[in-house]
Amino acid sequence: MSDEGSKRGSRADSLEAEPPLPPPPPPPPPGESSLVPTSPRYRPPLPAPLERIVGSGEPPVELAPRRKGEPLPPLPPSRLPGDQEVSAAGDSCEGPRRLPEVKLPEAAAGKGSPAEPEAGACREGERRGTGDQPETRSVYSSRSSSSGGSGDQRSGHQHQHHQPICKICFQGAEQGELLNPCRCDGSVRYTHQLCLLKWISERGSWTCELCCYRYHVTAIKMKQPCQWQSISITLVEKVQMIAVILGSLFLIASVTWLLWSAFSPYAVWQRKDILFQICYGMYGFMDLVCIGLIVHEGAAVYRVFKRWRAVNLHWDVLNYDKATDIEESSRGESSTSRTLWLPLSALRNRNLVHPTQLTSPRFQCGYVLLHLFNRMRAHEDVSEDNGSGEVVMRVTSV
């Protein structure tokens, strides 16, 4: 009993020692709403520019970020001017309302008010909210402009497809005049003159590779010596050219010496000497050999010269004339008559004679004999194959 009485006495003493609790604040008048909460909420300010947080007339003040575990600073006095309006509850950003003046201890007045960051954050949110609409408009305008640009690009491509272009460089008329040199039609109808001449020099033929039409060209003039280009020649052509050049030099020298020995008064003793008479005969025979060599190899050298001339001449390609083409085809005129230069393979193949086009009686007799021998050999092979029970067909070309 004494213990319980002592405990009750100590509890009563402690209750008397504690100060009394302050009375609750009076309710606000009906015209004003209680905007300041009993436990003030403090949110860390957003990283906004200093101009937005601080007024235009005050110097910028840097706000130190709150560290983790640090207690919240006390609420500073909200000493705002009478005409300044802020939004209630910093995160609601509703219509402008006035805050009632609340007096707080002076110790917390020097630490800065967190209401200003909240007001700045609210203004920043309002500015962001108001800035969303122009941004959306700009995005929409950029999309519309991009769609319009793509539409213009498509229309430009379609317009470009309708325009005639060169079938070699795929460029339009801005790179030069477009010609129609052959029977080709459609997208491969036109070409530039320079592109066609370069393609002819690279390909080595005056014939279109698509319609096999031989171009109508005319030579204008020779290029300048500084613009001359070399052509590719084979080893056989080099030997032929060297043989023709050396034979020509020997022929000129020997004929000059023979004429001087025959008509000069200073060569009377040479004409009477037997050794010089033998030399005259040998030189005459060598001159005949050189003449035959020049005649035999002169055609090949002349073809090489025509190729070189074709590369180093300025040519003019004419447009295709359908009436002229029909007239030439009706007359049966060969297109090789107007060919200025052909590749070596075409020139060599043109000189060959097909066995079905032999018109000489001598060639006809030889062809008949070869045909008879081949038929006899075919009969022997067939009889041997029939004995083995197998049928073999052999085709022999003559």
From Swiss-Prot:
Annotated S-S bridges: none
Region (Disordered): 1-158
Signal peptide: none
Phenotypic consequence of residue 182 to S: Abolishes ubiquitin ligase activity
Residues binding Zn(2+) 2, per UniProt: 182, 184, 208, 211
Pathway the protein takes part in: Protein modification; protein ubiquitination
Comp. bias regions, Pro residues: 19-31
Name of the protein: E3 ubiquitin-protein ligase MARCHF11
Species of the source: Rattus norvegicus (Rat)
